[in-house]
Swiss-Prot record:
<comment type="function">
    <text>Component of the sulfite reductase complex that catalyzes the 6-electron reduction of sulfite to sulfide. This is one of several activities required for the biosynthesis of L-cysteine from sulfate. The flavoprotein component catalyzes the electron flow from NADPH -&gt; FAD -&gt; FMN to the hemoprotein component.</text>
</comment>
<dbReference type="GO" id="GO:0000103">
    <property type="term" value="P:sulfate assimilation"/>
</dbReference>
<dbReference type="InterPro" id="IPR010199">
    <property type="entry name" value="CysJ"/>
</dbReference>
<dbReference type="Pfam" id="PF00175">
    <property type="entry name" value="NAD_binding_1"/>
</dbReference>
<feature type="binding site">
    <location>
        <position position="360"/>
    </location>
    <ligand>
        <name>FAD</name>
    </ligand>
</feature>
<feature type="binding site">
    <location>
        <begin position="117"/>
        <end position="120"/>
    </location>
    <ligand>
        <name>FMN</name>
    </ligand>
</feature>
<feature type="binding site">
    <location>
        <position position="326"/>
    </location>
    <ligand>
        <name>FAD</name>
    </ligand>
</feature>
<dbReference type="GO" id="GO:0004783">
    <property type="term" value="F:sulfite reductase (NADPH) activity"/>
</dbReference>
<dbReference type="InterPro" id="IPR017927">
    <property type="entry name" value="FAD-bd_FR_type"/>
</dbReference>
<keyword id="KW-0198">Cysteine biosynthesis</keyword>
<dbReference type="InterPro" id="IPR008254">
    <property type="entry name" value="Flavodoxin/NO_synth"/>
</dbReference>
<feature type="binding site">
    <location>
        <begin position="423"/>
        <end position="426"/>
    </location>
    <ligand>
        <name>FAD</name>
    </ligand>
</feature>
<keyword id="KW-0560">Oxidoreductase</keyword>
<dbReference type="InterPro" id="IPR029758">
    <property type="entry name" value="CysJ_Proteobact"/>
</dbReference>
<feature type="binding site">
    <location>
        <begin position="390"/>
        <end position="393"/>
    </location>
    <ligand>
        <name>FAD</name>
    </ligand>
</feature>
<dbReference type="InterPro" id="IPR023173">
    <property type="entry name" value="NADPH_Cyt_P450_Rdtase_alpha"/>
</dbReference>
<feature type="binding site">
    <location>
        <begin position="70"/>
        <end position="75"/>
    </location>
    <ligand>
        <name>FMN</name>
    </ligand>
</feature>
């Protein structure tokens, strides 16, 4: 008979259960013990069994595995198109998001396709970080039986263009896998390359894969993949909405111009969740277009008809609505230098590092101003890239605001040789769009930045500057749900008096005890600069206690500096208070990421 603990004890285990637990955990490292503690707490909080049942896809793996690693949705849409192509060719395929892929099964893959974007300065998209780290670790297996192909999406205005695709391609080859097709590195205008690549992949696989049975085809097409939420409006077919409110939420003295925008979605049926982003199709500044045309001896030719996306438009309208004018790239600099034959520009092009820095710091119009020449409309358009929408983290919950969507916009303002310049999208939203004006928008769903399913789960939110936006949505949702879980916000900006975004709302949440803790970092209010990562370290013991209680951690904001510094702070906290070395702490954080307890929305 099992001996039960006395009724007065607080121990919820019998002596026999306790003995079994001690036996099972006696040889575990501090990292393993800490992970198990948080793992089972999270399972209890979510109301899920400790060991999930095997998935249907795992039980009957398809010959073709297609992994989508997306940051802004482009890679996911392209992967869905390829999935549909393969199904139409009666080939058996499983499409899976990188964040859901059980990467330790990669050695069993025979045919592997990866479509991936790159974020920031060459980093993998958030949902692919765990897979990326695994493949580049000592644990990665040899892959002699795997054939693969990689399509990499990127933005050539960044130095490490399409780096994640390049990294996946080279690493898979190093591990012994064989290329089905040469890697493709595609810029923002990737559609033509993608169509060619998709067709080539399908043709190659037809000779390698048996035709799928009707049941297999139905399984592949029935949504046994992680589809994004359906929406009546898309990037390609956006909603025409109206601006309801535009309000500056920094003070007159602030060096930052941050706007709170409310957009009316009445009768549109457009739905979103906290964690999603709003895509905005902006228009270029007419004054900037006039300046550029004048420098290129095209003044007075704004009405000249030009072909754009299957239609004919006046040149000025084409530049306003269809071409990127505010972000320069090394390719544009090189192309213009070849037209201009300017010695100074050609010298810049000859130096790769100097070229990258010049493109980053010099808008197109200011490059032209350095060496103005006469160009035809055709030559000008041949240099430019298509305009792409900007994404903004949504700052509202529909449970609170109904048929509206709110965003927080940091307006980009600077000077070049004394001439004021603004960001393309932020300037459009702040300066050229009036209340009740129309704008084209769509929802970019982000299943990799979601509140816990269990309202009892505590959350830690780290978002300096405009990175605070999604956490406004989070707390609106938690309030509407009556969620009892604790909430802790880390926020930072230069000055308390000038830059405390949504201050009154946070104060109300603190007063009403919805916001359990708030830790603030004002970088310019004292001699020593203080940032959110410093507050995380200062509160390390409490942060670790929350993590041990199953807290989910969310980070939003700048990918290149803040997010890296915050991650280093979290690793330091885990190492110190979890009694681990830095490598173990980093692995522990990776496990949290896999469990969806550490999520980032960085840009």
């Amino acid at each position: 008979m099992t001996k039960q603990a006395p009724p007065t004890t607080v121990l919820p285990l019998s002596e026999e259960q306790l003995d079994r637990l001690q036996t099972a955990t006696g040889d575990l490292s501090p990292l393993q013990l800490a992970w198990i503690s948080g793992y089972f707490w999270g399972r209890v909080a979510e109301g899920k069994p400790a060991v999930p049942p095997p998935s249907q896809s795992a039980a009957a793996a398809a010959p073709i595995t297609l992994i989508s690693a997306s940051q802004t949705g482009n890679a996911r849409r392209l992967a869905e198109q390829l999935r549909d192509d393969l199904i139409a060719a009666r080939l058996d395929v499983v499409l899976i998001n990188a964040g859901d892929y059980k990467f330790k099964q990669i050695a069993q893959e025979k045919l592997l396709l990866i479509i991936t974007s790159t974020q920031g300065e060459g980093d993998p998209p958030e949902e692919a970080v765990a897979l990326y780290k695994y493949l580049f670790s000592k644990k990665a297996p040899a892959l002699p039986s795997t054939q693969f192909a990689v399509f990499g999406l990127g933005d050539s205005s960044y130095e490490h263009f399409a780096k994640t695709g390049k990294d996946f391609d080279s690493r898979l080859a190093e591990l012994g896998a064989q290329r089905l097709h040469d890697r493709v590195d595609a810029d923002v205008d990737y559609q033509a390359q993608a169509e060619t690549w998709r067709a080539a992949i399908v043709e190659q696989l037809k000779s390698r894969v048996a035709v799928a049975s009707p049941a297999q085809q139905q399984l592949a097409a029935s949504g046994n993949v992680n589809e994004v939420d359906s929406s009546p409006y898309t990037k390609e077919a956006p909603l025409t909405a109206h601006l309801a409110l535009s309000q500056k939420i920094t003070s007159r003295q602030s060096l930052k111009d941050v706007r709170h925008l409310e957009i009316d979605l009445t009768d549109s049926g457009l739905r979103y969740q906290p964690g999603d982003a709003l895509g905005v199709w902006y228009e270029n500044d007419p004054a900037l277009i006039c300046e550029l045309l004048a420098l290129l001896w095209l003044k007075g030719k704004g009405d000249e008809p030009v072909p754009v996306a299957g239609q004919t438009l006046p040149l000025a309208e084409a530049l306003q609505k269809h071409y990127e004018l505010t972000q320069n790239t090394p390719a544009i600099v090189a192309g213009y230098a070849a037209f201009a034959r300017d010695e100074a520009l050609l010298a810049v092009v000859a130096d790769k590092a100097q070229l990258q820095q010049f493109a980053l710091a010099t808008p197109i119009v200011d490059m032209v101003r350095r060496a103005p020449i006469e160009l035809s409309a055709e030559q000008l358009l041949s240099l430019l890239r298509p305009l792409t929408p900007r994404l903004y983290s949504i700052a509202s919950s529909q449970a609170e605001v109904g048929e509206e969507v709110h965003i927080t916009v940091g307006v980009v303002r600077y000077e070049i040789d004394g001439r004021p310049r603004t960001g393309g999208a932020s300037g459009y939203l702040a300066d050229r769009l009036g209340e009740d004006d129309e704008l084209r928008v769509f929802i970019e769903h982000n299943d990799n930045f979601r509140l816990p399913g269990d309202p009892n789960t505590p959350v830690i939110m780290i978002g300096p500057g405009t990175g605070i936006a999604p956490f406004r949505a989070f707390l609106q949702q938690r309030e509407a749900d009556g969620a009892p879980g604790q909430n802790w916000l880390f926020f930072g900006n230069p000055h308390f008096t000038d830059d405390f975004l949504y201050q009154v709302e946070w104060q109300r949440y603190v007063k009403e005890r919805l916001l359990t803790k708030i830790s603030l970092a004002w970088s310019r209010d004292q001699a020593e600069k203080i940032y959110v990562q410093d507050r995380v370290r200062e509160q390390g013991a409490e942060v670790w206690r929350w993590i041990q209680q199953g807290a989910h951690i969310y980070v939003c904001g700048d990918a290149n500096r803040m997010a890296r510094d915050v991650e280093q702070a979290l690793v330091a906290v885990v190492a110190e208070y979890g009694c681990m070395d830095p490598e173990q702490a980093d692995e522990y954080l990776s496990e949290l990421r896999i469990e969806r307890r550490y999520q980032r929305d960085v840009y």
